[in-house]
Regions:
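Non-globular, low-confidence helical/coil segments that flank catalytic cores
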Residues: 2-7, 17-289
Length: 289
């Protein structure tokens, strides 16, 4: 009996040793992610900055965060050993989404900068076309009906048909990134008015990961959107210390009701990786080791 107990104990210890490193990934483990689509949620506080690795190993950014957020963005890109970016998508021109564009382009070679071709309001704040031109990147103005093949992933673009001069957030470009049966829905600062138009005109908005519009505040993320998207994970680009509205109790309760696991811009991690293998998605913490 004692011998059997010892064998059971050894087996348990072996399993613990094998799984001890699970849940975190560092610089030395990034090669294992090739062949997957990976969304890296960079921990910059109130602001949007994401790195997207497509299955063939190419890299895109979805928004850049503020200028002062650049050190954290650079840290993540260094962990990932990124030297070149195939493209940068800017959902709109607010500084907490696009303010870091020039600093990124100073260090990294960027092939293309993707903009909404219908937004003649928010981009004026940062003039991304001039920045792209200065660094030799091609500017691609999207109209909202494109389906882009990007290195084994697909980016389906949606842009609101009517520009909103009263609420600039509702001019945000939305892109659904998909790889086989997995997908990420990136929404910029889309609020409820734009959500309604999106749901009326976008055929299949289901996604495993939903980036909540407008930093998780109560003016976005309607019940109708959650019912249509049916996400497993919800990303909120804000935290209680910097922006209490981002940890809105009503939205938190709504996410819980719909079975959505929420991730905020808080903690010591450099980023959270949402790793899509084409069948399912898992969330893994990225630490600066």
């Amino acid at each position: 009996m004692k011998k059997r107990n010892i064998l059971v104990l050894i087996a348990v210890l072996a399993v613990l040793l094998l799984t001890a490193g699970c849940g975190e990934t560092g610089q030395g483990e990034q090669e294992d992610l090739k062949g997957n689509m990976v969304l890296s949620f960079i921990n910059i506080g109130k602001g949007d900055a994401f790195l997207i690795q497509v299955p063939d190993g190419g890299y895109y950014m979805w928004d850049t965060g503020k200028e002062e957020d650049y050190p954290m963005v650079e840290r993540l890109l260094d962990i990932k050993k990124v030297e070149n970016l195939d493209g940068i998508f800017l959902s709109h021109g607010h500084k907490d989404h696009a303010g870091g564009l020039e600093l990124i382009m100073e260090k990294y070679s960027v092939e293309k900068v993707y903009l909404s071709g219908k937004d003649d309001i928010t981009y004026k704040k940062i003039n991304p076309e001039q920045t792209a031109s200065e660094y030799g990147a091609e500017v691609v103005k999207l109209q909202g009906d494109e389906i882009l093949g990007l290195g084994g992933a697909t980016a389906q673009v949606w842009i609101p048909g009517n520009r909103d001069t009263e609420n600039e957030n509702n001019n945000s470009m939305v892109v659904r990134w998909s790889f086989k049966d997995t997908s990420f829905l990136m929404t910029g600062d889309m609020e409820k008015k734009e959500e309604k138009q999106f749901l009326q005109t976008f055929e299949d908005c289901r996604a495993d990961v939903l980036k909540l519009g407008h930093h998780g505040e109560k003016d976005a993320t309607s019940k109708a959107l959650l019912e249509a998207v049916m996400p497993v994970y919800g990303i909120i680009t804000g935290n209680e210390e910097e922006n209490p509205d981002s940890v809105n109790k009503k939205i938190a309760e709504r996410l819980k009701k719909y079975g959505v696991k929420a991730y905020y811009s808080e903690g010591e991690q450099t980023a959270w990786d949402f790793i899509a293998d084409g069948t399912s998605v898992k969330a893994v913490k990225v630490m600066d080791k």
